[in-house]
Amino acid sequence: MKRTYQPSKLVRKRRHGFRARMSTKGGRKVIAARRAQGRKRLSA
């Protein structure tokens, strides 16, 4: 059986990166929430 997590830096950046987050309204809310929490890393 193939495992579900097949790491790829490119896919990770494209799906969960900062620019991907900023490109949607919901993503901007995610970044804002993580800023409010004081997260060291905002996105992948």
UniProtKB/Swiss-Prot annotation:
Start-end of Basic residues biased regions = 10-19, 26-44
Disordered as annotated region, ranges: 1-44
What Gene3D superfamilies is this protein classified in? 1.10.287.3980
Please indicate if the UniProt record lists Amino-acid biosynthesis as a keyword.
Answer: no
Pfam families, per database record:
Ribosomal_L34
Alphabetized UniProt keyword annotations: Ribonucleoprotein, Ribosomal protein
Q: Which InterPro entries does this one have?
A: Ribosomal_bL34 (IPR000271), Ribosomal_bL34_CS (IPR020939)
Q: List residues traversing the bilayer.
A: none
* One Gene Ontology term of the molecular function aspect: structural constituent of ribosome
| Superkingdom per UniProt | Bacteria
Question: Quick one: a GO biological-process term for this protein?
Answer: translation
Q: Which GO terms describe its cellular component?
A: ribonucleoprotein complex; ribosome
NCBIfam families from the entry?
A: rpmH_bact
Q: Which family does it belong to?
A: Belongs to the bacterial ribosomal protein bL34 family.
Q: What is this protein called?
A: Large ribosomal subunit protein bL34
Q: Which organism is it from?
A: Rhizobium etli (strain ATCC 51251 / DSM 11541 / JCM 21823 / NBRC 15573 / CFN 42)
